[in-house]
Amino acid sequence: MQHLAVFGGTFDPIHWGHLLIAEAALQQIPIEKVIWVPSLNPPHKKASAFRHRLAMLQLATQDNPAFTVSSVEKNRSGVSYAINTLTDLSVCFPNTHWYWIVGLDTFQTLPRWYRGQELAPMCDWLIAPRLVGGENIAQSELICKQVKQQLRKQSDTIHWHLLHIPLVGVSSSLIRKLYRIGKSIRYLVPEDVRSYIAAHKLYSEDSE
Protein backbone atom coordinates (compact mmCIF):
# COMPACT_ATOMS: atom_id res chain seq x y z
CA MET A 1 0.00 0.00 0.00
CA GLN A 2 1.32 3.42 -0.95
CA HIS A 3 1.18 6.44 1.35
CA LEU A 4 0.24 9.73 -0.31
CA ALA A 5 -0.60 13.17 1.06
CA VAL A 6 -3.04 15.64 -0.45
CA PHE A 7 -2.29 19.34 -0.11
CA GLY A 8 -5.40 21.13 -1.26
CA GLY A 9 -5.89 24.86 -1.33
CA THR A 10 -6.44 27.98 -3.35
CA PHE A 11 -2.69 28.68 -3.75
CA ASP A 12 -3.29 32.24 -4.91
CA PRO A 13 -0.31 32.33 -5.06
CA ILE A 14 1.73 29.42 -3.75
CA HIS A 15 4.53 30.69 -1.49
CA TRP A 16 7.52 29.43 0.47
CA GLY A 17 5.37 28.73 3.52
CA HIS A 18 3.33 26.18 1.55
CA LEU A 19 6.49 24.51 0.27
CA LEU A 20 8.02 24.30 3.75
CA ILE A 21 4.87 22.64 5.08
CA ALA A 22 4.87 20.04 2.30
CA GLU A 23 8.57 19.31 2.80
CA ALA A 24 8.01 18.94 6.55
CA ALA A 25 5.30 16.37 5.84
CA LEU A 26 7.68 14.39 3.64
CA GLN A 27 10.40 14.44 6.28
CA GLN A 28 8.26 13.73 9.34
CA ILE A 29 5.65 11.27 8.04
CA PRO A 30 6.27 8.08 6.00
CA ILE A 31 4.68 9.34 2.77
CA GLU A 32 6.03 8.90 -0.73
CA LYS A 33 4.51 11.90 -2.47
CA VAL A 34 2.62 15.11 -1.86
CA ILE A 35 -0.17 15.70 -4.37
CA TRP A 36 -0.92 19.40 -4.73
CA VAL A 37 -4.56 20.07 -5.62
CA PRO A 38 -5.62 23.63 -6.47
CA SER A 39 -9.31 24.24 -5.84
CA LEU A 40 -11.31 25.10 -8.95
CA ASN A 41 -14.11 26.92 -7.12
CA PRO A 42 -13.13 27.18 -3.45
CA PRO A 43 -16.05 27.77 -1.07
CA HIS A 44 -16.22 31.24 0.50
CA LYS A 45 -13.37 32.58 -1.67
CA LYS A 46 -12.90 34.44 -4.92
CA ALA A 47 -9.67 33.32 -6.56
CA SER A 48 -7.56 34.04 -9.62
CA ALA A 49 -8.19 31.97 -12.73
CA PHE A 50 -7.56 28.27 -12.19
CA ARG A 51 -5.09 28.11 -15.09
CA HIS A 52 -2.85 30.70 -13.43
CA ARG A 53 -2.89 29.02 -10.03
CA LEU A 54 -2.21 25.63 -11.62
CA ALA A 55 0.70 27.02 -13.64
CA MET A 56 2.26 28.67 -10.57
CA LEU A 57 2.01 25.40 -8.65
CA GLN A 58 3.74 23.54 -11.46
CA LEU A 59 6.54 26.10 -11.57
CA ALA A 60 7.05 26.03 -7.81
CA THR A 61 7.13 22.24 -7.44
CA GLN A 62 8.85 21.10 -10.63
CA ASP A 63 12.27 20.56 -9.03
CA ASN A 64 11.05 18.12 -6.36
CA PRO A 65 10.30 14.57 -7.58
CA ALA A 66 8.21 13.93 -4.45
CA PHE A 67 5.80 16.72 -5.45
CA THR A 68 3.13 16.27 -8.10
CA VAL A 69 0.36 18.64 -9.16
CA SER A 70 -3.12 17.32 -9.90
CA SER A 71 -5.78 19.04 -11.97
CA VAL A 72 -8.43 16.63 -10.70
CA GLU A 73 -10.80 19.53 -10.03
CA LYS A 74 -10.40 21.13 -13.45
CA ASN A 75 -13.57 19.74 -15.01
CA ARG A 76 -15.70 19.75 -11.88
CA SER A 77 -18.82 21.88 -11.79
CA GLY A 78 -19.93 23.74 -8.71
CA VAL A 79 -18.05 24.36 -5.48
CA SER A 80 -14.88 22.39 -4.69
CA TYR A 81 -15.33 20.14 -1.66
CA ALA A 82 -12.57 18.07 -0.07
CA ILE A 83 -14.54 14.83 0.09
CA ASN A 84 -15.18 14.91 -3.67
CA THR A 85 -11.49 15.53 -4.32
CA LEU A 86 -10.39 12.64 -2.12
CA THR A 87 -12.97 10.32 -3.69
CA ASP A 88 -11.74 11.19 -7.19
CA LEU A 89 -8.09 10.77 -6.22
CA SER A 90 -8.85 7.38 -4.67
CA VAL A 91 -10.02 6.21 -8.08
CA CYS A 92 -6.77 7.41 -9.68
CA PHE A 93 -4.60 6.01 -6.86
CA PRO A 94 -6.17 2.80 -5.53
CA ASN A 95 -4.76 0.91 -2.56
CA THR A 96 -3.55 4.10 -0.90
CA HIS A 97 -3.31 5.24 2.69
CA TRP A 98 -4.25 8.90 2.49
CA TYR A 99 -3.05 11.91 4.44
CA TRP A 100 -4.41 15.44 4.15
CA ILE A 101 -2.22 18.47 4.83
CA VAL A 102 -4.10 21.37 6.34
CA GLY A 103 -3.49 24.51 8.39
CA LEU A 104 -4.66 24.63 11.99
CA ASP A 105 -7.23 27.36 11.34
CA THR A 106 -8.84 25.30 8.60
CA PHE A 107 -8.66 22.08 10.62
CA GLN A 108 -10.64 23.78 13.39
CA THR A 109 -13.58 24.11 11.00
CA LEU A 110 -13.54 20.44 9.92
CA PRO A 111 -16.68 19.51 11.91
CA ARG A 112 -18.56 22.10 9.81
CA TRP A 113 -17.18 21.04 6.41
CA TYR A 114 -19.47 19.66 3.75
CA ARG A 115 -19.79 15.97 4.72
CA GLY A 116 -16.95 16.59 7.15
CA GLN A 117 -18.04 13.80 9.47
CA GLU A 118 -17.77 11.37 6.58
CA LEU A 119 -14.44 12.76 5.39
CA ALA A 120 -12.71 12.84 8.81
CA PRO A 121 -11.89 9.11 9.07
CA MET A 122 -10.98 8.72 5.39
CA CYS A 123 -7.43 10.02 5.87
CA ASP A 124 -4.87 10.99 8.50
CA TRP A 125 -4.65 14.74 9.05
CA LEU A 126 -1.28 16.48 8.94
CA ILE A 127 -1.68 19.84 10.62
CA ALA A 128 0.51 22.90 10.20
CA PRO A 129 0.27 24.94 13.42
CA ARG A 130 -0.40 28.66 13.20
CA LEU A 131 2.36 30.20 15.27
CA VAL A 132 2.17 33.77 14.00
CA GLY A 133 -0.82 34.55 16.20
CA GLY A 134 1.01 33.68 19.39
CA GLU A 135 -0.09 30.08 19.74
CA ASN A 136 2.53 27.60 20.88
CA ILE A 137 2.71 23.90 20.09
CA ALA A 138 0.85 22.94 23.28
CA GLN A 139 -2.02 25.26 22.38
CA SER A 140 -2.11 23.88 18.84
CA GLU A 141 -2.29 20.33 20.19
CA LEU A 142 -5.15 21.33 22.49
CA ILE A 143 -7.10 22.74 19.54
CA CYS A 144 -6.57 19.50 17.59
CA LYS A 145 -7.80 17.46 20.54
CA GLN A 146 -10.90 19.64 20.77
CA VAL A 147 -11.67 19.00 17.10
CA LYS A 148 -11.23 15.27 17.65
CA GLN A 149 -13.58 15.43 20.63
CA GLN A 150 -16.24 17.23 18.59
CA LEU A 151 -16.07 14.58 15.89
CA ARG A 152 -16.13 11.79 18.46
CA LYS A 153 -19.49 13.10 19.70
CA GLN A 154 -20.74 12.50 16.17
CA SER A 155 -19.44 8.90 16.24
CA ASP A 156 -16.50 9.65 13.97
CA THR A 157 -12.85 8.71 14.43
CA ILE A 158 -9.95 10.86 13.35
CA HIS A 159 -6.17 10.53 13.36
CA TRP A 160 -4.01 13.64 13.30
CA HIS A 161 -0.34 14.58 13.46
CA LEU A 162 1.02 18.04 14.22
CA LEU A 163 3.82 19.01 11.84
CA HIS A 164 6.88 20.77 13.20
CA ILE A 165 7.65 23.66 10.87
CA PRO A 166 9.75 26.84 11.06
CA LEU A 167 7.94 30.08 11.77
CA VAL A 168 7.17 31.78 8.44
CA GLY A 169 4.93 34.82 8.68
CA VAL A 170 3.76 34.87 5.08
CA SER A 171 0.35 34.34 3.52
CA SER A 172 -1.13 34.48 0.04
CA SER A 173 -3.34 37.41 1.04
CA LEU A 174 -0.28 39.35 2.25
CA ILE A 175 1.54 38.67 -1.02
CA ARG A 176 -1.43 39.86 -3.07
CA LYS A 177 -1.72 43.01 -0.97
CA LEU A 178 1.99 43.81 -1.23
CA TYR A 179 2.02 43.29 -4.98
CA ARG A 180 -1.11 45.39 -5.47
CA ILE A 181 0.49 48.40 -3.78
CA GLY A 182 3.78 48.00 -5.61
CA LYS A 183 5.86 46.42 -2.86
CA SER A 184 8.42 43.65 -3.44
CA ILE A 185 7.41 40.01 -3.05
CA ARG A 186 10.90 38.74 -3.78
CA TYR A 187 11.84 35.84 -1.44
CA LEU A 188 8.20 35.37 -0.43
CA VAL A 189 7.52 33.20 -3.48
CA PRO A 190 9.82 31.13 -5.73
CA GLU A 191 11.44 33.28 -8.40
CA ASP A 192 9.63 31.47 -11.24
CA VAL A 193 6.33 32.26 -9.54
CA ARG A 194 7.27 35.91 -9.09
CA SER A 195 8.15 36.14 -12.79
CA TYR A 196 4.85 34.50 -13.73
CA ILE A 197 2.88 36.95 -11.60
CA ALA A 198 4.64 39.87 -13.28
CA ALA A 199 4.27 38.47 -16.80
CA HIS A 200 0.53 37.92 -16.41
CA LYS A 201 -0.09 41.04 -14.32
CA LEU A 202 -1.77 39.07 -11.57
CA TYR A 203 -2.96 40.92 -8.47
CA SER A 204 -2.82 44.30 -10.20
CA GLU A 205 -5.63 46.55 -11.41
CA ASP A 206 -5.29 45.30 -15.00
CA SER A 207 -4.82 41.61 -14.16
CA GLU A 208 -5.80 39.00 -16.72
Swiss-Prot record:
Please give the InterPro entries that the UniProt record associates with this protein: Cyt_trans-like, NadD/NMNAT, Rossmann-like_a/b/a_fold
Kindly give the Gene3D superfamilies that the UniProt entry links to this protein.
Answer: HUPs (3.40.50.620)
* Catalysed reactions, as listed in the record: nicotinate beta-D-ribonucleotide + ATP + H(+) = deamido-NAD(+) + diphosphate
Taxonomically, the superkingdom here is Bacteria
Q: What is this enzyme's class at the first EC digit?
A: transferase
Q: Which SUPFAM superfamilies match?
A: Nucleotidylyl transferase (SSF52374)
**BP-aspect Gene Ontology terms:** NAD biosynthetic process
Q: What is its EC number?
A: 2.7.7.18
Q: Name one GO molecular function term.
A: ATP binding
What does the record give as its pathway? Answer: Cofactor biosynthesis; NAD(+) biosynthesis; deamido-NAD(+) from nicotinate D-ribonucleotide: step 1/1
Listed A to Z, the keywords are: ATP-binding, NAD, Nucleotide-binding, Nucleotidyltransferase, Pyridine nucleotide biosynthesis, Transferase
As for what it does, the entry says: Catalyzes the reversible adenylation of nicotinate mononucleotide (NaMN) to nicotinic acid adenine dinucleotide (NaAD).
What is the official name of this protein in its record? Probable nicotinate-nucleotide adenylyltransferase
- Please report the organism this UniProt entry assigns to the protein: Nostoc sp. (strain PCC 7120 / SAG 25.82 / UTEX 2576)
Lineage, top ranks? Bacteria, Bacillati, Cyanobacteriota, Cyanophyceae, Nostocales
